[in-house]
């Protein structure tokens, strides 16, 4: 098992927030991300052609909270192509901007516990770490989904204790921007 690194680092963090029709939760999510980070933190929102006022709410929140992030961008896709295409477009954008820090991807409906982002960030003081994931705290009554996700969570944790896992929890995960190449 890996021990949590004791040394610190100040690698820049880009929070990648893919959204689609998140009007009911987007302000709560942005408030959730409004924390004091001991490293430069920017925000990239990629909207997959929302038909509600999600983008307007994001822009208004950023206008009202200009000092929360070092930099912020909102990319609006002209048509809905799904989360995977949105994330790929965002990563291509970061590549074009020569971004070389860490990327935290999080879902709009996923709340993040206090200290989680700083803890995930801390793992990267070990240069052998390429990606880390968090443990989801799901608030659902769908027992089939909960059982299914619990099984994968148990498998992922067991694999991580042995060496590494082949999949991460998509609602909150972080990786080195140079961990892999995105083909345009």
Residue ranges and their predicted role:
Residues 47-58, 79, 110:
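A conserved acidic beta->alpha catalytic loop
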Residues 103:
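Short aromatic/hydrophobic "clamp" motif used to bind/position activated sugar donors
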Residues 114-146:
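Conserved donor NDP-sugar-binding/catalytic core segment of glycosyltransferases
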Residues 1-9, 159-160:
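N-terminal membrane-anchoring/stem segments of glycan-assembly enzymes
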Residues 24-28, 52-61, 87, 115:
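Acidic helix N-cap motif at the loop->helix transition within catalytic regions
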Residues 77-97:
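Glycine-rich, basic loop-to-helix element that forms the pyrophosphate-binding segment
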Residues 12-14, 42:
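Cell-envelope/extracellular polymer assembly enzymes that use nucleotide-activated donors
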Residues 31-40:
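Short, acidic, metal-binding catalytic loop of nucleotide-sugar glycosyltransferases
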